[in-house]
Amino acid sequence: MSSDQEMAIFGEAAPYLRKSEKERIEAQNKPFDAKTSVFVAEPKESFVKGTVQSREGGKVTVKTEAGATLTVKEDQVFPMNPPKFDKIEDMAMMTHLHEPAVLYNLKERYAAWMIYTYSGLFCVTVNPYKWLPVYNAEVVTAYRGKKRQEAPPHIFSISDNAYQFMLTDRENQSILITGESGAGKTVNTKRVIQYFATIAVTGEKKKEEPTPGKMQGTLEDQIISANPLLEAFGNAKTVRNDNSSRFGKFIRIHFGTTGKLASADIETYLLEKSRVTFQLKAERSYHIFYQIMSNKKPELIEMLLITTNPYDYAFVSQGEITVPSIDDQEELMATDSAIEILGFTSDERVSIYKLTGAVMHYGNLKFKQKQREEQAEPDGTEVADKAAYLQGLNSADLLKALCYPRVKVGNEFVTKGQTVQQVYNAVGALAKAVYDKMFLWMVTRINQQLDTKQPRQYFIGVLDIAGFEIFDFNSLEQLCINFTNEKLQQFFNHHMFVLEQEEYKKEGIEWEFIDFGMDLAACIELIEKPMGIFSILEEECMFPKATDTSFKNKLYEQHLGKSNNFQKPKPAKGKAEAHFSLIHYAGTVDYNITGWLDKNKDPLNETVVGLYQKSSVKTLAFLFAERQSSEEGGTKKGGKKKGSSFQTVSALFRENLNKLMTNLRSTHPHFVRCIIPNETKTPGAMEHELVLHQLRCNGVLEGIRICRKGFPSRILYADFKQRYKVLNASAIPEGQFIDSKKASEKLLGSIDIDHTQYKFGHTKVFFKAGLLGTLEEMRDEKLAQLITRTQAMCRGFLMRVEFRKMMERRESIFCIQYNIRAFMNVKHWPWMKLYFKIKPLLKSAETEKEMANMKEEFEKTKEDLAKSEAKRKELEEKMVALMQEKNDLQLQVQAEADGLADAEERCDQLIKTKIQLEAKIKEVTERAEDEEEINAELTAKKRKLEDECSELKKDIDDLELTLAKVEKEKHATENKVKNLTEEMAGLDENIAKLTKEKKALQEAHQQTLDDLQAEEDKVNTLTKAKTKLEQQVDDLEGSLEQEKKLRMDLERAKRKLEGDLKLAQESTMDIENDKQQLDEKLKKKEFEMSNLQSKIEDEQALAMQLQKKIKELQARTEELEEEIEAERASRAKAEKQRSDLSRELEEISERLEEAGGATSAQIEMNKKREAEFQKMRRDLEEATLQHEATAAALRKKHADSVAELGEQIDNLQRVKQKLEKEKSELKMEIDDLASNMETVSKAKGNLEKMCRTLEDQLSEVKTKEEEHQRLINELSAQKARLQTESGEFSRQLDEKEALVSQLSRGKQAFTQQIEELKRQLEEETKAKSALAHAVQSSRHDCDLLREQYEEEQEAKAELQRAMSKANSEVAQWRTKYETDAIQRTEELEEAKKKLAQRLQDAEEHVEAVNAKCASLEKTKQRLQNEVEDLMLDVERSNAACAALDKKQRNFDKILAEWKHKYEETQAELEASQKESRSLSTELFKVKNAYEESLDQLETLKRENKNLQQEISDLTEQIAEGGKHIHELEKVKKQIEQEKSELQAALEEAEASLEHEEGKILRIQLELNQVKSEIDRKIAEKDEEIDQMKRNHIRVVESMQSTLDAEIRSRNDALRIKKKMEGDLNEMEIQLNHANRQATEAIRNLRNTQGVLKDTQLHLDDAIRGQDDLKEQLAMVERRANLMQAEIEELRASLEQTERSRRVAEQELLDASERVQLLHTQNTSLINTKKKLETDISQIQGEMEDIVQEARNAEEKAKKAITDAAMMAEELKKEQDTSAHLERMKKNMEQTVKDLQHRLDEAEQLALKGGKKQIQKLEARVRELENEVENEQKRNVEAVKGLRKHERRVKELTYQTEEDRKNVLRLQDLVDKLQSKVKAYKRQAEEAEEQSNVNLSKFRKLQHELEEAEERADIAESQVNKLRVKSREVHTKVISEE
């Protein structure tokens, strides 16, 4: 758990991601009782927290936090997790895992706005319904490169893990973001894309030329900008989501080999086209329509000829028009900006807006029906003109094509007339097609823009698809969306539960298969299997006369009662009609099939499509360019069938879905589950039951369980050994081949981890959750230790090199000082002055010759430099040519790779085509069989129909006879149905009425009127029955003819299908042959791959052996270093003795110098013997020069050999330098003492004794030198042994290279080689530039030395020799560099030839490999990656061996040179000893002078010591200052180090005192001042030695003051740094205090917000309740008003009827005066009518009693209806019949009105026309009276039938009550048994967990014991080794002493 400081990198997002330290501490200290703290089931909240009060008899009494007391069963109580698990980030870590624990953890995190939570292997996110600051740039940076356990849960963490897995595992990844609609999938998708665009940013603009209208955005900008554009055209507001994606998309983000963005592409699925023309009330259309009308860009309003009011356009105003959470104006600007960034041209942009506006105008097109025709015609042309203008069409042509489309009939085209409804349907279809095609075209354009043509290796796919939807009205779009989610959930279940456990079984891991019950195959097969829903739908679309009803009937026949997931929906009042129900994983959905056939066929007006193809708007013409109209099809293809190109929407959808699932299966998936917290979109509120339902459906708990029980992490053995062997390399034995599995077992066994947390499979090692992260942390720590140790060794080596250089400079300074002192002593001698004058004259000729030679050399040097420049230019040109060749080869390799990829794609396409053809063949075969069966059935039916036709002709007369009987039965049935309908209407009205009395009166009145109306309607119904039956007979004859025609069509279709079948079979045979060839190739490739695998294993074994030998060599090197350390100690003693001797000799020399100037007699004697001394001095000087040259060579060789032999040779060189220095000092002292030999003979005797002692010491040194020689011989023997081993290694390496060369000729290996050669060329160029710089510096230095020589040739003869020496060294350097340059150019030429040969081989090999690897790309990539890793190891081992070989050769060369120089030095040392013995007699003479000058020597010695101490202190301080400045200037270190080394070499040649240039600039300036002071003192010939000393002291003091100032400034800087660090700490403390205060304030604010939220929730509940009451009251009032209005209408109609009756009676009375008979008949009719009214009133009373009884039995009837399926079916049928009768009733009412009208006319005619009309009316009245009597009889029969049904309902009710009681008893028994089973399971699981814990503890203790024993053994062995080494060291020390 991270601290608050570590969380500070997340900025303001930290509180929303992880609990603070204070909260964690409070949670840990919170009181908690694990036995009583529980969750308890509760009806309202599902689960609540509580405390156990008591447990008795399987019942638990719990007191909830709200204070309520509940008594529940044991299985309804769940233990609570300790407080430290509150708001836990990974729910798989919980102690108690159950539904309430998961629910409350999500709820508490959601309340704290921590919306992301891990759930085992996947992530759960809850929609916050508000903006949170958790997606800022600093959050993206904080999550980059973090492991999952290192950072809080977040979508960025999932994304980064996928990114890292892609890079390390070399496998494509996918992120599946799923959830219901409105759960937040789209937002998370955008965040994933934002993360990848940020971390894998390329930062490079597109390389194509900028074109007008294009913004040059980077690839990441374009990827991010694709979302706003797609959301504007593809997202809309739905009931559950304000920004719902109405299409699915799969975004693939491609990455290059380095992990940078390469390109991207988008695949879309099933845009919801119907939303363009239709929306529900609470929804709206796509955002782009409302963005355009937001008036943010007024120029769009003018261009599109629209207004800003959405209600002006029918297509977009059927639902809501505004969304509170969306600002359409801002979204329009974002959409417009995205169009520009994505590179759409200005014409394309304008056409997009124009087509969108045209769709809006389509909704306003009006059509009307022509008079006296069904033909439609335009109702105005203004809207059509606007739409046609925007689409680049002629409005007249458009209207003509809509109203009079051309249709192909046979081989001719005819003009077809359209009804108004057909025209509206065609307009809607065209609008949807234009919008859909435009959307798909935009996606294609986006993909073209995102395809950068850069090389890409892997991709990460992000899936965002419409969530699961359950609406009131669910159509074909909802079925497709829900089916997609069903498939994705099945993919998740299969991946998480099935594949996981199957892999355990396959790998041989002990595992008991767990069935989680999450298989969704039944529902998926129901939809997509043959004869499933989609199959039936597509089959129906093939038949021209299929309807929605026939489709529904087929669904019922195939699936109703046969599949548990297919059900018949139950009717619900207030909801849309549903035809079938499916049980999905997320719930039961009712589907309405209305219009599915048209949606699936997606028909278009071909005439209008032809106009589109000729449009002046290029985009519109392009959209429909590929669609051929019926006219073009007829002209181009003749009579060819169009079924071959016919593809339904469902088929296209299934094809895309199968592609998606194939893509997902080929990737490594990462799941993100989005959860809806509530249905009201309220931030912070969580509905328990809703969340639990989603958790159960998504398999969250099951995923956590399998994560805890299973082994989610697994690695191949070879990969594990390669990656983690660094944890304990000693566990894997070196030098012998060991299997990767055994190596992994040993490695894991040697690591301190819980061994129950992993299992070994056949090919992989499996880990429990979290263990792999622990191993990664251990590996990181180990690598950090190794790197730290390596850095320490490198720093130590560099500092030792620096120290050696400092010591060399110190010794050079001492030498120069000594020479200057000696020169200052002799320069005032007269003879010396004479010598100075004569010497140049003698050597002037030689000097001129030397100058001439130098000029010649200079000219040669210039020529050589010109030649080297020319060669350099040639090499640069060659390098350019090589680079060009390299680029050409890379292009060729890329082209070959593209060709390979194309071949693979073609192969994949062929395989897919084969699979599709096989499926089509199967479908065609099945369809042919079905057609044959149908044909046989039709043939039989034809025969039957022919027979039946003859029988029908005979039976027509019988039917006419039985017609009356049928009519009676029909009327009886209708009466029964009508009575049941009236009963249901009464029941419905009973629910709605306000008071019983008012409702009863209204029903009675209305029922009376309805009965009267119905009685009149039935009269007309009976008259039309006969005509209907006759029409049915005619229809049967017509259907017979149609069946004949259909049979003919089927026979033609059968012949065509047989032809297609033959073609398909032939293509199948070809495909089978191709398949066999591919199988043979595949077998060959597998054999080749097995051979390659064996070779790779051999290579691994050789690599292991080489690594073992390298380690042995390293151990031997360590032993040599230990011996060198011992030798170093002995050398320190010798050095101490040499320092003592040098000090004594210096004292002697100083005394002798003082004694030399004591007396004039001694000076005279010196003059006499000056000649002898000069000769001796020349000899000594020559010897000294030889020794100095030898010392310089030894120092150089010593510096070269230090890298291999370490401190041993360094000490030896230091001894040699001390001896040479002593020799030179002794010779100089002998020179000075020779002039005083006669006067100090006594002192010589004493000095002779001292020389004897020195000889003894030299003999000791000689013995030590012999020991060194012996050591060198041993090293030579060791070198020979190493040489033989190196030869063996080289032979093995040659064999290895021969084997590896076959594998290393791939594209990537050659690319690495070319880059290596390029780097070598750059290094050569740098070396040449350094050489040129060195030559130029040497020329400059030669000029300087020449000037010094001309100026001071009288006083500096010795410096002249030094200059000549420097020139010779420069020449050596030059010749060396020239030879090296020539050699390197030859090597470069050779390398170029090798490279050309290798490139040629590579081309051949690449061609061969490309030809071989078409179908094995994925396997090839994996093996190639493994080979690359092996190649890296081989190259490293080759490089190491080559370096060892090179070092060995250098070592041999150095040893030989060292041996030769040592022999020469030994000879010179012997000569010096002889010379020293010859001069020892003379040394006795100076003994007295030595004694006399002892006091002066002591004083000089003290001064010398002080000066030396000061110089050493200054040197150390300078070194410290150099280190400090070196640390400050790390960037310049390498360049200036090379420069300083060359400069130091040249400065040593010219005897300067400068330090390295560029390292210490300030100290270099001071040393230059010192040099100028020394030069000036040399030029001043008359200055005394004392003045020189004072000058030195002044220089030292100035250096000291400068150094003190430097130290003070450094101390000030350190003090300021400490002060700043203190201030920073104080600021951090203040910041922590401020953060704590802020967190407290935020917590108080959250508490206040929580209280406010609770208050707001209560207030919202109260307001909702009040609103519900108001709605109910308003509904009741509306119903009352409607009823009152109906009553008023009925009263008005009654009054009108009464008036008309009175008028008719008056007219009849008038007519009766003229015709008495008619009057009497009318009177009898009125009496009969009154009698009928009394009878009807009696019947009405009886009906009221029946209705009252039905009301009393209402509740029982409802239960009976729900429980009895057959009764429900009866009621459904009766309801359908009732609806049909209701329509008939309305028709009859219209008929009654017509009859009434006719009656009035008849009466008028009767008044006018005479007796015939009256007689007809009298006959009609008699018929009516007969019909009324018949109707009365039917009513009586209906009453009897109703009573029978009531008895049946009562019986069913009693039976249902008994069944319900039995079910309850059985349910109680089942619950008890289940509770017992759960208790037993829980006890077993607890016991198992306890045993596992004990077993793990035992294994851990056993492992620790074994490790302790191993450590004890190792420590004991180390102690023994140390003892042996200490004894050896002790014996060596004793022997040396």
UniProtKB/Swiss-Prot annotation:
Q: Which residue intervals make up region (Disordered)?
A: 1116-1164
Residues annotated as binding ATP are G179, E180, S181, G182, A183, G184, K185, T186
Sites where N6,N6,N6-trimethyllysine occurs are at K130
- List this protein's GO terms for biological process: muscle contraction
Q: What is its main location?
A: cytoplasm
Q: Which residues form the Myosin N-terminal SH3-like domain?
A: 33-82
- Cellular compartment(s): Cytoplasm, Myofibril
Q: Which residues carry this modification: Phosphotyrosine?
A: Y389, Y424, Y1462, Y1490
What exactly does this protein do? Muscle contraction.
Q: How does this chain assemble?
A: Muscle myosin is a hexameric protein that consists of 2 heavy chain subunits (MHC), 2 alkali light chain subunits (MLC) and 2 regulatory light chain subunits (MLC-2).
Output this protein's name.
Myosin-4
The record lists the lineage as: Eukaryota, Metazoa, Chordata, Craniata, Vertebrata
